[in-house]
């Protein structure tokens, strides 16, 4: 399970060091793709494959489904962390997410998200009130 918030730096070659606690789960390979809210999503390869198959099973006659599948597949990049736990983020992914040197990696239960640190701070500020008001509705049984 992927949980927590981490602040690795992006180096000049576009490499990002994954949090040590997630490396074993991602050692078999991972997929980086566009995520929600201009973040990047990082899935274990098997999890991504299962989600992609499910998305592809949706009727291809639906224009929205076709667009989603095309964007998902076109933006996916298979990676295998190097010996130091680093992955190289493509220029297209870095641009999409607006990544600077300062990044934030957050656990989202079954995948990771990579954010630019300033964008993550702004997102948290924007959504804090909504999180507080929805807490009881969505987490009532959890709390």
UniProtKB/Swiss-Prot annotation:
Biological process annotations from GO: negative regulation of DNA-templated transcription initiation
GO molecular function, one term: DNA-binding transcription factor activity
Keyword Transferase recorded: no
Keyword Cytoplasm: yes
Record domain SpoVT-AbrB: where: 5-47, 76-119
Domain of life: Bacteria
Membership in a protein family: Belongs to the MraZ family.
Protein name: Transcriptional regulator MraZ
Gene: mraZ
